[in-house]
Amino acid sequence: MTYYLFNPENDMALALGQKHYNPPKNIVRFSEDLSMLPLWYAKTGDCVLIRQEVPDNWLQAERDQLQIGVSWLPLEQYWRKSDAADFLFPWGWSYTVYNEWRKKGKSKQWMDCEMIRNLSGRNWVCDVLAIPYIKESVLPAGFVYPQILKSYESVSSFVLQQQEAVLKAPWSSSGKGLYWADGTLTPSLKHWVMNVLEQQGFVMGEMKCDKVLDFAMEFTCEEHTCSFLGYSFFITENGKYKGNWLESDDTMERYLETYVDRCRLVEVQHLLQQFFTQHVVGYYQGCLGVDMMIIRQAGAYYLHPCVEINLRMNMGVVAHSIYEKYICKKSHGRFYVTSYATHDELVAFHAQMIEANPLIFEDGTVKSGYMNLTYIGEQTMSMAYIMVES
C-alpha cells in the first residue's frame, strides 16, 4: 500500500537545509486544512495520511458517484501501526520527512536528501537554459540569462544594469523568496540580499519579463525513466498561486499554439525529459514541474522554457489528475486553493457556492457545479475546491 502525505512545509525545510524543521503555526494550520488533498491524486486501494479527524462519511455521495476507492487515516494512528509502509508518497522529500519516517520504521525507501536539495535549487534553471537548442532557437535575442550572484557587490551591479529585475533566494516555498528591484539600491534591498547570502550562499538574478501567460510542463521520474505527464495552466496574483485550469492537454496545447509553434513545445519537452533522465533519475522518484511563461519582447511572443523547477508534487499535477479522472470531457473549469481571514468567512463562502452552483454528475464524472475537495472542520481557514461548467 502507498501512503500519501500533504507536507507543504517541505519547501522551507529544504531551504533551511536542516535535518529537523519545525514550521510556523500558519504553515501547520494550512497543512492540516488541506491534508485531504492527496485523495484526488492517490490510486485506488491506497491511503491518505491526514492531520485532522475526518468523518468516514465525508463527501460520501460524491465519492460514490466518482468511484473513489481511497481510504484515509489520522497520522497519529498511523504512527501506532506496527507495519512499515510499503511506499511513502509525500508532497515533497527533505531531511525532515525522511528522517522522521526512517526513525519510526515507517519507510523502507532510500533517498539521497542532500542530492534532492541540490536538485531543488533555482540555480538549475541556468543549466536548462544553457541547452544549445533552447539558447539558439527558443529564447529571444537580448534575453538576459539568470545569473548566480555570490556577493552584495555582484547583486548591486546586476540591479543597476537592469531597469527591472527579480532577485530570488535559491530555495524557498513557491511564490516566496522573491525581491523585485527597480534599478535602484535601497537599504531594504541590501538587508534582503545579505540575509539570503548568509543563509543560502548566493542569490539568483533574473530580468523581469513581459509575461503573457503562466503555465508548466509536468513530468514524473521513475526508477529508470522520466515521462511527460502533461500541461498545467496556473493562475497567480502578485506572484502568489491561486489556482489551475481544468482542461485537456489538447486544449491547453492548442491555446499555446496561438503564441508559439507546437514543434517548439514538443522539442523542449523532449529535451527536458533527456535532461531529467540524466540529472534527476536515480536520485528522485515522483512528480516534478517546470514552470514556464509565454513572454512578449519587441512585439513578438516567445517561450520562456524554464522559470523554475519544482522537484516535488505540485498543484498543477493535482489539477491534471482531477481533470483526467473526475471531470466530464465535455466540461471545463478551475481548481482553486484559497485561505480566509476567519473560519466564518470560509463557511459563508462554502454555503453560498453550494447554493449557487449545484453539483451535477454525468457518467461518473463532474459535469458542472462547485465541490470542495478538502474537509471543512470547526476551525478550517483554507480549502481547495473546483468550479466546473459545461
Located regions from the model:
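N-terminal-proximal low-complexity accessory segments that begin disordered
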Residues: M1-L39, T44
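Conserved N-proximal alpha/beta basic substrate-recognition cap immediately N-terminal to
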Residues: I27-Y41, L49-S154
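Glycine-rich phosphate-binding loop of ATP-grasp-fold ATP-dependent ligases
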Residues: Y145-P146, E164-L189, A216, G239-L256
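Phosphate-binding site of ATP-dependent enzymes
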Residues: Q163, S188-G243, M293-C306
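A long amphipathic alpha-helix within ATP-dependent nucleotide-binding catalytic cores
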Residues: E198-F202, M207, Y241-Y302, S339-V366
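Charge-biased, low-complexity intrinsically disordered regions
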Residues: V212, I235-N238, R264-L272, L303, ...
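ATP-dependent carboxylate/phosphate-activation module, predominantly the ATP-grasp catalytic core
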Residues: F219-Q274, N310-V337
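Peripheral (often C-terminal) accessory segments that flank ATP-dependent C-N-forming ligase machineries
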Residues: C328-S390
